[in-house]
C-alpha cells in the first residue's frame, strides 16, 4: 500500500483479495489516531448527527456542518483516503445540486471521494457526479437516510433484507451492477444480509465494503470509530464487545479529577 491511499489502490486490494479496513470518523484527534494505525479509509459520515450531536436521525445534518466535519477529519489524515457523505438534500433536489455540494466537500473540505446514500434510488445523480469528475462511493441496501426517512429502526436485526432471500439478493445484485455501470468507484453495502453480500461481491469488479449486516465475504469493513473504542455513554453499561471501553475509562478519569479538585490536590495533565 502506498504512503497515500488512492481509489486505484483500494480497487487493487479487491483484485488481490486483501480486505479494506475503514473507520467512520468525525474529528481530528480520532482521525489522526486511526490514520497512524494504518486504516485505509476514513469515512466522514452524517452519522455524526446521531452519534455525536444527539439528533434523532441523520436527516437533520446540514451541508455546512458536513463541511466542518470533513475539514476536521482531513486535517487528521495523511495516509488514509477520505470519503465524505453528501447530507440529505442535494441529491434529492437535483443532479446539479449534488454536483455543487460534492464540489464544496472536495474543494473546501478536502474529501477524496463522495458517498451518496441510497444511491440506487438516484442513478441519474450518480452518473452526473461521475461525469463531473466526482469519485462516487455509492451506498445501497437499508441505508441510514432511507431508514430515517421511512421511520425504520436502523439495525441489522430490523432490516427487511436481513435474512437475504434469493429475491432480495437478486434485486441488490441488480442495483450493484447498475451503480457500477453508472461509474461508482466503490460500493457501501449496508444492512442487507450476508447471502446478498456474497452475491454482490461476486457480481461487480469494484470494491464492496460495509459496516454490518453484510457478512464476511465483503471486500472490507468500515466501523464507527467511536463504537470501536467504546466512546459513548451507552457503553458504560453495555456488554457488547468493543476493542476498548473508553467510556468506562473516561468515567473513572472524571471521577478521579473531581475527587482531586474537591481535595485541593494538583490535577493531572
Regions found by a protein language model. Name each.
Residues 2-269:
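Alpha/beta enzyme core
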Amino acid at each position: 500500500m502506498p504512503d497515500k491511499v488512492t481509489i486505484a489502490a483500494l480497487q487493487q486490494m479487491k483484485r488481490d483479495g486483501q480486505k479494506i479496513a475503514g473507520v467512520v470518523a468525525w474529528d481530528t484527534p480520532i482521525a489522526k489516531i486511526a490514520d497512524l494505525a494504518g486504516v485505509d479509509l476514513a469515512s466522514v459520515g452524517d452519522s455524526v448527527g446521531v452519534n455525536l450531536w444527539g439528533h434523532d436521525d441523520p436527516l437533520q445534518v446540514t451541508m455546512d456542518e458536513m463541511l466542518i466535519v470533513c475539514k476536521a477529519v482531513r486535517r487528521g489524515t495523511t495516509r488514509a483516503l477520505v470519503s465524505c457523505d453528501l447530507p440529505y438534500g442535494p441529491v434529492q433536489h437535483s443532479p446539479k445540486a449534488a454536483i455543487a455540494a460534492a464540489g464544496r466537500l472536495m474543494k473546501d473540505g478536502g474529501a477524496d471521494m463522495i458517498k451518496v446514500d441510497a444511491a440506487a434510488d438516484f442513478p441519474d445523480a450518480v452518473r452526473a457526479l461521475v461525469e463531473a469528475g466526482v469519485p462516487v462511493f455509492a451506498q445501497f441496501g437499508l441505508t441510514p437516510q432511507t431508514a430515517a426517512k421511512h421511520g425504520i429502526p436502523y439495525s441489522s436485526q430490523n432490516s427487511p433484507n436481513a435474512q437475504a432471500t434469493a429475491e432480495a439478493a437478486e434485486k441488490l445484485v441488480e442495483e450493484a451492477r447498475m451503480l457500477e455501470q453508472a461509474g461508482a468507484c466503490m460500493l457501501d453495502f449496508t444492512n442487507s444480509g450476508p447471502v446478498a453480500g456474497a452475491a454482490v461481491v461476486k457480481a461487480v469488479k469494484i470494491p464492496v465494503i460495509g459496516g454490518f449486516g453484510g457478512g464476511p465475504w465483503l471486500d472490507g469493513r468500515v466501523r464507527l470509530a467511536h463504537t470501536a473504542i467504546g466512546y459513548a455513554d451507552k457503553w458504560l453499561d453495555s456488554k457488547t464487545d468493543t476493542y476498548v471501553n473508553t467510556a468506562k475509562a473516561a468515567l473513572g478519569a472524571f471521577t478521579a479529577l473531581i475527587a482531586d479538585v474537591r481535595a485541593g490536590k494538583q490535577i493531572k495533565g
